[in-house]
């Protein structure tokens, strides 16, 4: 399996490159970065202290032509542009980017008609196991429990709430026969009045180098249940993304991490 990495100079890009280099059965075929990046022209492993023989390039088409699958943790506009070229070249895409609009996410199905696409707001195996626990809890605690979701990330994250937090909200809503759009409350300030029954509240924390913390609270009278996942490094995201890339071998269609993990 030949893998290309988008955003090669970023924190996640570097973790992905390192993970590909350490994973049997896969090779680093291309390392891609934006035009003007200091990394362009350097060995993809230079910042890791490893010589890979793969030079970082801003020529997306040439880079993708050497790969079977692209792993993309960049920004929505960049990812959509990458998808267009990947479709032309028949290259599968693993999308870890978050912050897409509902319309942009809906377009992934069109790409899946031609190439294999895995999109998930979080590639971590542990997070996806947490999703299952939340689904079970939401069904059991559908009556008499208020739901609040609290997430925390590093100060550089540009979207809020996180894609993972939104996915958690969707899971709760769907497990209880509703939609997140009907129930979500994204901000509270000033005199808000009593909490509205049936809402799903979100709280966002941004600071320092927090990799990613997510907690779903089911709060009843006299008790509360908290389901928490904490990421100590981006390694789990990278390993899940490489696993997803391997899953796409020979496949067309739109998939998520449930498909990759067989959940």
Curated annotation (Swiss-Prot):
Catalyzes the conversion of 4-hydroxy-tetrahydrodipicolinate (HTPA) to tetrahydrodipicolinate. It holds the Pfam family DapB_C. It is found in: Cytoplasm. GO terms for cellular component: cytosol. Transmembrane segments: none annotated. It comes from Ralstonia nicotianae (strain ATCC BAA-1114 / GMI1000). Pathway: Amino-acid biosynthesis; L-lysine biosynthesis via DAP pathway; (S)-tetrahydrodipicolinate from L-aspartate: step 4/4. Keywords: Amino-acid biosynthesis, Cytoplasm, Diaminopimelate biosynthesis, Lysine biosynthesis, NAD, NADP, Oxidoreductase. The active site is at residues 153, 157. Its EC number is 1.17.1.8. GO terms for biological process: diaminopimelate biosynthetic process; lysine biosynthetic process via diaminopimelate. One of its GO terms (molecular function) is NADP binding. This is 4-hydroxy-tetrahydrodipicolinate reductase.
């Amino acid at each position: 399996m030949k893998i290309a990495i988008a955003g090669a100079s970023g924190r996640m890009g570097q973790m992905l490159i390192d993970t590909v280099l350490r994973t049997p059965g896969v090779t680093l075929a291309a390392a891609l970065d934006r035009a003007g990046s200091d990394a362009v022209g350097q060995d993809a492993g230079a910042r890791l202290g490893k010589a890979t023989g793969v030079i970082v390039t801003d020529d997306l088409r040439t880079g993708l032509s050497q790969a079977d699958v692209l792993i993309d943790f960049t920004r929505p506009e960049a990812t959509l542009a990458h998808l267009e070229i990947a479709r032309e070249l028949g290259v599968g895409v693993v999308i870890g980017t978050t912050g897409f609009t509902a319309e942009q996410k809906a377009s992934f199905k069109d790409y899946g008609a031609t190439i294999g696409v895995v999109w998930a707001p979080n590639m971590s195996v542990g997070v996806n196991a947490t999703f299952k626990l939340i689904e079970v809890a939401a069904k059991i605690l559908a009556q008499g429990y208020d739901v609040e979701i609290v997430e925390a990330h590093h100060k550089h994250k540009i979207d809020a709430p996180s894609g993972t937090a939104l996915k958690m909200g969707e899971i709760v809503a769907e497990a209880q026969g509703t939609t997140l759009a009907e129930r979500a409350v994204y901000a509270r300030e000033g005199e808000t009045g009593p909490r509205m029954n049936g809402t799903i509240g979100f709280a966002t924390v941004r600071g320092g180098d927090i990799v990613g913390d997510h907690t779903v609270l089911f709060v009843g009278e006299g008790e509360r249940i908290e389901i928490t996942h904490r990421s100590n490094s981006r390694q789990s995201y990278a390993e899940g993304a490489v696993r997803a890339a391997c899953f796409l071998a020979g496949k067309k269609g739109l998939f998520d991490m449930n498909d990759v993990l067989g959940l």
